[in-house]
Amino acid sequence: MRLLATALILTATSAWAATVPPREGPGENGSPAWFLQPSSTDPAGHTVVDAQGRITVHPHVAGDETFNGFRCTESTICQNRYGPSRLTLDRVQWKQTMGYTFEYPIRLPPGDGGPPAAGIDSKGNIWIYQRKAPGNPQLFKYSPDHKLILTVAESVIGHQDKPHGMAVDAQDNVWLCDINGSTVMKVSPDGKLLQTFGQKHHRGDWDEAKGQRLLWQPIAIAFAPNGDIYIGQGHGNESPNDVESDDPTNIMGAARVLQLDKNGTFIRQWFGHEAGQGKFDQIHGLAVDPKTGDIWIGDREQYRIQVHSGDGKFLKTILTRNLSSTLSFDNDGFPWMATGQDGQVLKLDRNGKVIGAIGNGMGIGHGQFIESAYFDFDKDGNIYVGDTSTGRVTKLVKPKK
């Protein structure tokens, strides 16, 4: 009888254990080991950063907003309001094996506001795009030795209502994506506004036949080797309810990729709102494969990357274990992915396998990110990473050979 009871207990214990997801796993098939780590509190940009990159969070004061956000309450495109909040999830972390170290050499101006994007020009200058309250500059240029050499005034580019992606083109022009402002702006190397796509605060559809050239939540931008411009649109889980709008210029209500030539002339666009292979709920990351010209789309809330050809044909889906927040290719042509609130930057192969990781997870400590965001590589392979929710830029220093 005692043996039977023991056997039943062991069987029940084994059955229970089989239903509990593992909290860690070994490295295999070229990927590092992984483990789960809890989430951290998001300070939403209300931080003070000292000269060592240490962060102090200060209380949020009502009315002290760094951008004018919209609330999503009704549309089917909103994030699932009945499931667990993303800020309560345990997060997959990958063991760091590549030997990168963390530095904080860029001193942003005092005050609130996270810098979601960093970009590097051909001369090694570092551009930083920051969320700030109206009346403050939001675009800064630093020399390769991290000295501030240019501040672009609000009088030039206007207030950027919710900065997201930024990219530097082959001529060292800087392109800015303001999702709530509904614009993409092209800024010269010396800080002059050259061109604006979209209409300020008029979210809508690009309809070339009507001469209607509006943007819908422009969030990320990338360039093909021939100079073609790809603008990713659709921060779906945070959209206002304009998909139920009566505005005849705004009827699609879906994430999309807009392709223009190097002069800004319309080529095509494709949408992600239908079910089936290659579709996407939102675009948070966007990158062009320099070897093939393929378009990599980070469909963040669905934990996947959708790969399309340069002319919009679906090629494959890559499922990820992390938020596919932002994407870029390094100097050797490898794809990398920042994992947002998972707090790392991952090196991938072209099948999406994780082959290396950098970052200590979600948080405000050394080597951590509240939300690792848009990033770029210098000529030595070091990586500059923006953080949407803390006022610092992290330099990931590549180990010397």
PLM regions and their residue ranges:
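Sequence-structural signature of mature extracellular/luminal beta-sheet repeat domains
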Residues: 18-401
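Bacterial N-terminal signal peptides
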Residues: 5-14
